[in-house]
């Protein structure tokens, strides 16, 4: 499994994150091409340089603003409309908007303002829009299946912003990171910004200081701080996660011959809501040639008790069969493919490095088909051609 690990010993900011992504292999030209889909032409320049931090080579990404362009008070509504109206892929839009929403909600609570009216003094500035949307682009380009992170160093001291002098961590940063593992005063400056906090809060699947990793590539992104004891860098580790035994699963089954279809359907909904991995019904014939339904529930062991209780509450069953099972599954990863109507996410099923089958994300296809009034099968034919072309290019 391809994973990404954030080592946040010196915190994280938007520019550090972009630098680490570029250092890890996301092409700067690709970022520039994708970011050009936002209506910000002529307002900024994006550059990357190699620097040294405490003797460690790192990539520093900078967003240089054109002085005649200033929109420091864009609202969340303005930013959302900008992203939604762009030609970015659906997955990139969703990832970027999730991060902006997180920051907007934090600012809304802190300043007691309606969400849509929150003025993004810093996040609404062009450089922060580039940081967040660029992060979404870079993460999608890496195509990782899981994202993990260490404890997040926040720093200490004070920071000057649009609202005056504030203690570190800034209120928005702390609000965003509620419930997540943090460290305070490890460095005498603002180590983690609200943008960096949102990147972690919205994209990391799990926080852990120790993971069984097999590193494949390491990227270092440089911050602006100089002359500090701890290097002001973010370290990203692209790795393969060693194959772990899959969690034990249990198959619960019962035969039912005296319930209405409506009640059975409701029971299935309850089981899915409670965390069943799969629930399915099979028509069967029982003793005395009675027509019946076999209800099958696939569950993780830690959900078995709750699902069993729901089964007895919502069905007429007075007993069930139980069998522990193991699942074998192909590795999966996502790619973005172009069509005449927009980009679509496609899930590849892999055996080693070989793609054995692929499937487009249905909801994205449905939206494109409805938006552009194109037959769904026509869209799928275009996707087939795009995927085959992409795979042929990769093989060559």
Swiss-Prot record:
Keywords: Nickel. It comes from the Bacteria. The keyword Transmembrane does not apply. InterPro entries: Ni_insertion. GO terms for molecular function: lyase activity; nickel cation binding. The keyword Hydrolase does not apply. Signal peptide: none annotated. Belongs to the LarC family. PANTHER family: NICKEL INSERTION PROTEIN-RELATED, PYRIDINIUM-3,5-BISTHIOCARBOXYLIC ACID MONONUCLEOTIDE NICKEL INSERTION PROTEIN. HAMAP family: LarC. This is Putative nickel insertion protein. It comes from Wolinella succinogenes (strain ATCC 29543 / DSM 1740 / CCUG 13145 / JCM 31913 / LMG 7466 / NCTC 11488 / FDC 602W). The lineage of its organism: Bacteria, Pseudomonadati, Campylobacterota, Epsilonproteobacteria, Campylobacterales.
């Amino acid at each position: 499994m391809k994973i990404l690990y954030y080592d946040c010993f010196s915190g994280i900011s938007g520019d550090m994150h972009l630098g680490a992504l570029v250092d890890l292999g996301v092409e700067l030209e690709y970022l520039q091409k994708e970011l050009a889909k936002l209506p910000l032409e002529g307002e900024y320049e994006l550059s990357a340089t190699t620097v040294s931090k405490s003797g460690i080579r790192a990539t520093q990404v900078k967003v240089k603003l054109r002085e005649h362009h200033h929109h420091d008070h864009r609202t969340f509504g303005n930013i959302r409309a900008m992203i939604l109206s762009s030609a970015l892929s659906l997955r990139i839009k969703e990832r970027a908007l999730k991060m902006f929403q997180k920051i907007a909600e934090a600012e809304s609570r802190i300043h007691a303002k309606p969400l849509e009216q929150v003025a993004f003094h810093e996040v609404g500035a062009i450089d922060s829009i580039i940081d967040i949307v660029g992060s979404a682009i870079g993460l999608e380009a890496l195509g990782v299946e899981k994202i993990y992170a260490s404890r997040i160093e926040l720093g200490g001291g004070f920071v000057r912003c649009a609202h005056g002098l504030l203690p570190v961590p800034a209120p928005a940063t702390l609000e965003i990171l509620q419930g997540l593992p943090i460290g305070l005063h490890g460095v005498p400056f603002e180590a983690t910004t609200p943008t960096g906090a949102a990147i972690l809060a919205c994209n990391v699947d799990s926080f852990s200081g120790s993971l069984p990793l097999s590193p494949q590539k390491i990227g270092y992104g440089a911050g602006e701080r100089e002359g500090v004891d701890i290097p002001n860098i973010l370290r990203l580790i692209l790795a393969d996660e060693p194959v772990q035994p899959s969690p034990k699963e249990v198959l619960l089954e019962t035969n039912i011959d005296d319930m209405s279809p409506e009640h059975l359907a409701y029971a299935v909904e309850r089981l899915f809501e409670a965390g069943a991995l799969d629930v399915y019904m099979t028509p069967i014939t029982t003793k005395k040639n009675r027509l019946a339904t076999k209800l099958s529930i696939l569950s993780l062991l830690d959900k078995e008790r709750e699902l069993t209780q729901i089964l007895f509450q919502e069905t007429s069953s007075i007993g069930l069969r139980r069998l522990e099972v193991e699942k074998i599954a192909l590795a999966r990863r996502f790619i973005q493919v172009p069509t005449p109507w927009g980009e679509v996410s496609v899930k590849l099923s892999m055996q080693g490095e070989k793609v054995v089958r692929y499937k487009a994300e249905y909801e994205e296809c449905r939206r494109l088909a409805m938006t552009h009034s194109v037959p769904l099968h026509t869209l799928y034919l275009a996707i087939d051609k795009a995927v085959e072309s992409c795979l042929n290019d990769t093989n060559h």
